[in-house]
């Protein structure tokens, strides 16, 4: 099953909102200027993806699930995940299964992730980080991977202990989502992680701009992986007995 991951550096003062319904524009009015731009940019990118991939001209109705996770109201529409890092907006979409996306700006973290976040890492994860040539970068990439899985599972607030990663073997175990796969890479100062349940057959990566629309940058799969030294792939271990 194919997943789509699109990024947009939203440098425009105001995004073009012609594909957004009136209720979305109304909801944005109560937000601060920074929050409003992020909110609208994320939904503009989602709306443009829905038009580009499925021919849907206006963003469908979105609800908030009890977990706090946004979702299309219609269960017949794709699952999606939104992420923001600096001026970059990201959307991940899949017509099958569930998705989770996270983006992090590397230069925004001048030190290792804080002590509270480090406490959520297993000894295996901390040992792997310490052995890397750039522990700051490696710690942030692992954190990004964790966040994508937690967003997939709807557990961004209190689900840290439900997930363990083994970076050396590329395996993960989630108590909430027993079948999942994650792909992650570092692109310049940005690290990204795309999680999908049950598995990523193909990940189609796109860049978006209002002027040129969508441009496919790469297609990733089990057989077709980038030469990037930072690319990581995690696959679920069987549930612990």
Positions of PLM-derived features:
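Conserved nucleotide-ligand handling architecture
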Residues: 1-241
């Amino acid at each position: 099953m194919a997943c789509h991951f699109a990024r947009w550096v939203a440098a425009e003062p105001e995004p073009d909102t012609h594909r957004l319904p009136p209720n979305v524009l109304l909801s944005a009015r109560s937000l601060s200027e920074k929050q409003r731009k992020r909110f609208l940019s994320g939904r503009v990118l989602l709306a443009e993806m829905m038009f580009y991939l499925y021919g849907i001209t206006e963003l469908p109705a979105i609800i908030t699930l009890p977990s706090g996770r946004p979702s299309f109201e219609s269960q017949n529409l794709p699952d999606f995940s939104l992420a923001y890092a600096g001026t970059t907006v990201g959307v991940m979409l899949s017509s099958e299964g569930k998705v989770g996306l996270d983006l992090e700006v590397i230069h925004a973290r001048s030190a290792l992730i804080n002590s509270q976040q480090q406490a959520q890492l297993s000894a295996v994860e901390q040992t792997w980080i310490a052995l890397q040539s750039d522990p700051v970068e490696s710690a942030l990439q692992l954190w990004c991977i964790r966040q994508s899985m937690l967003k997939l599972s709807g557990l961004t607030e209190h689900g840290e202990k439900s997930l363990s990663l083994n970076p050396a073997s590329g395996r993960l175990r989630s108590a909430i989502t027993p079948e999942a796969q994650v792909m992650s890479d570092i692109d310049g100062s940005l690290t990204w992680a795309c999680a999908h349940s049950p598995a990523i057959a193909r990940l189609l990566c796109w860049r978006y701009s209002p002027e040129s629309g969508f441009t496919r940058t790469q297609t990733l799969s089990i057989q077709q992986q980038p030469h990037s030294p930072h690319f990581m792939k995690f696959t679920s271990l069987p549930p612990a007995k």
